[in-house]
Amino acid sequence: MSIFGVFTEHEVEVSDNIKISQIEHEPWPMPTLKRYNYFMKEADHISKYDYCFYFDVDMGLVAKVGDEVLSDLVATMHPYLSFAPKEQRSYDRNPKSLAYVGFGEEGENYYAGGFNGGSTKEFLKMSEVIANRVTKELKHDIIPLWHDESHMNRYLIDNPPTLSLTPSYCFAEEQMGNPNYPYEPKIIALKKNHNELRN
């Protein structure tokens, strides 16, 4: 049985397979930066299950996602940045940050923050490391370039995923209908108004 966990500051309807976790309203970028902290607050509940996957609320499932995504540590190649030269990928280059990636130590892929997971043990292990790093940095007013995604990419360089999913699982909506884009969509990263969401 699959259980869906929803982290929200709003009141929402619940059902037997949905668990609601209330979070406080905070200004951008805290809701995304602190997502791994939210996961750790629910670690006791999450640990009841064999696998745990996270995906952004603005993702749309348009095809079957099945056992092919099951592995210990799963990450999804970024629909754009994975194909850029390593030195041009937008890792956090601030040496004061725990998400820092120096030139020459980039990973094989750059991963999107929108869909990741794996065995519950490995997912919570990653979540704990990232949550601790975020908490430590916030005490010094340090926020990485791409927030939780920057921390995740640093972690995945040090702990490579056992499965790298193609951009089919974080398919940029603006690529729909593009005959030159070599992937079929399974999970779509929907277009959004960034200014509206962050204000």
Q: Model regions: which residues?
A:
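Catalytic core and acceptor-binding pocket of nucleotide-sugar-dependent glycosyltransferases
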Residues: 105-193
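Conserved glycosyltransferase catalytic-site signature
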Residues: 32, 36, 57-59, 145-150
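Short, polar loop motifs at secondary-structure junctions
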Residues: 5-13, 57-64, 169-170
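A structural signal for short, well-ordered beta-strand segments and their strand-loop junctions
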Residues: 5-6, 52-56, 117, 163-166
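Short, hydrophobic beta-strand segments that form beta-sheet elements in well-ordered domains
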Residues: 1-9, 53, 75
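GT-A fold catalytic core of metal-dependent nucleotide-sugar glycosyltransferases
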Residues: 36-86
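PAPS-dependent sulfotransferase catalytic domain
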Residues: 68-122, 129-130, 149
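Active-site-proximal specificity loops/subdomain of glycosyltransferases
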Residues: 7-50
